[in-house]
Structure formats: structure tokens, C-alpha cells
Amino acid sequence: MPNTPDRKYKRILLKLSGEQLMGDEGFGIDPKVLDKMALEIGQLVGIGVQVGLVIGGGNLFRGAALSRAGLDRVTGDHMGMLATVMNALAMRDALERSNISSTVMSAIPMHGVTDQYDRRKALRLLDNGEVVIFSAGTGNPFFTTDSAACLRGIEVNAELVLKATKVDGVYSADPMKDPTAVRYSKLTYEKVLTEQLGVMDLTAICLCQDHNMPVRVFQMDKQGALLNIVVGGDEGTLIQGKETEEA
């Protein structure tokens, strides 16, 4: 990788799962993981990439799982949204400790804790080089944080949605269970939907398809992968339309 890389993308939307914040703890938030992620995001900011960020809440709460155990689904989803706000606040703190300006916006009004989501304000902040962390999902139950990430990416005119996962892309089967699973370097939205490959929920993929928003699935734990993508490197799996050139 060159010492002074040129960015390929001006603005991206990065989706992190809540589980990635746990580290080896198994629950909650590992500050060491936050600091590592802040450092990697800081590398992007340092070369002029504008970063929007969405973090899941699965390290703290999973509404869908508890709804199956009897908790009202809407109540559970609202609790899950609050978990994403907690993660967003923790990430903001880590970014600020690394001298990276950041703002948390929430789809649910939380005066005195976060800013309320405002697209025009988010665009201004991104233009000024601040990292904007979008929390509380879409603000509506039954929508995942994957859908929220794609929605926010489309709204703020990101050029690419990046989904960080535990594995280095999308496979034909679960590589943890099936050693013969094959990794795809490229996929179309249609193939993901038809074969239900489980990259994201289908609502998120349909949204990206409708708005021609490319998605790249990559392994966050791989050192330098995030920076490599934004300077044009080939990491993980790219999902796009049939007629779209390499994103």
C-alpha cells in the first residue's frame, strides 16, 4: 500500500455490528476495540474521506430474540434502538479521544444526549470533515440496523455502504460450518435476493437495489482492510447491479 494513498471514495457509510464492540468480553463494550476502530476511521478522515457510521446494538440487546421469548416485538425493537445509542455514544467518546470530531444523531429525539437526526445538518457536518454516527436505527420497529445503514447512506449521498463482518466477504454457505464454502468476489443484488445469501436482511438489499447503492462486505478485523477499500483495493465481496462497473 502506498505511503500517501489517494482516496477512491469521497463519502462512505460504514456499518459495524454491535457484536464487534464486545471484543473477547462476550458482552458489552471493550474499550480496546473502540480505540482500534477509532484509529482505523481516523485513517480515512486523514486522507479526506467523509465517514457516516451506523452501529448495531446486538452486544447489549436483541429485540428480535427476546420477542420470540415472549417480549412484545415493538417494545423489544425500541429497547434495541436505545442500545445502538449507547454504542454510538461510546464510539463518539473513542473518536474524540483520538482528536476526531464526531457527532451522534438519533432517529429518536433524545434532547441533551444526542442531536436529533437532520439530513441537512448531517450533510454539513460530513462536508466539514466530521464523523457522523447515526443511531436508533430508522426510528421505527421491524427495521434492522442494516436497513438503517443503507437508508442513511442513500440519504447522505454516500458512494458506498461498507458492512464490516467477522468473515472476509460473502460465501456460498457458512464458512464456519462448511469448509467447501466458496467466497464471492462480486455479487448482484438479484443473486443475493434469489439465493437469500444472508448478507443483509432483504429489505436493506432491496433498498440498495432500488437506489443503485453498492455494498461491500469485508472483514473489519483484517488489518488495513478498511483503508485499502477506500483507496480502491479489492477486499471482501462487492454487491451491485448487473450493469454497474467496479465500485
Swiss-Prot record:
Residues 23-28 are annotated as: Involved in allosteric activation by GTP. It is found in: Cytoplasm. Keywords: Allosteric enzyme, ATP-binding, Cytoplasm, Kinase, Nucleotide-binding, Pyrimidine biosynthesis, Transferase. Pathway: Pyrimidine metabolism; CTP biosynthesis via de novo pathway; UDP from UMP (UMPK route): step 1/1. Its EC number is 2.7.4.22. UMP binds at G57, D77, T138, G139, N140, P141, F142, F143, T144, T145. GO terms for biological process: 'de novo' CTP biosynthetic process; UDP biosynthetic process. Its main location: cytoplasm. It is an enzyme of class 2 (transferase). ATP binds at K15, L16, S17, G18, G58, R62, T165, Y171, D174. GO terms for cellular component: cytosol. Allosterically activated by GTP. Inhibited by UTP. One of its GO terms (molecular function) is UMP kinase activity. It catalyses: UMP + ATP = UDP + ADP. Catalyzes the reversible phosphorylation of UMP to UDP. Homohexamer. Belongs to the UMP kinase family. This is Uridylate kinase. It comes from Saccharophagus degradans (strain 2-40 / ATCC 43961 / DSM 17024).
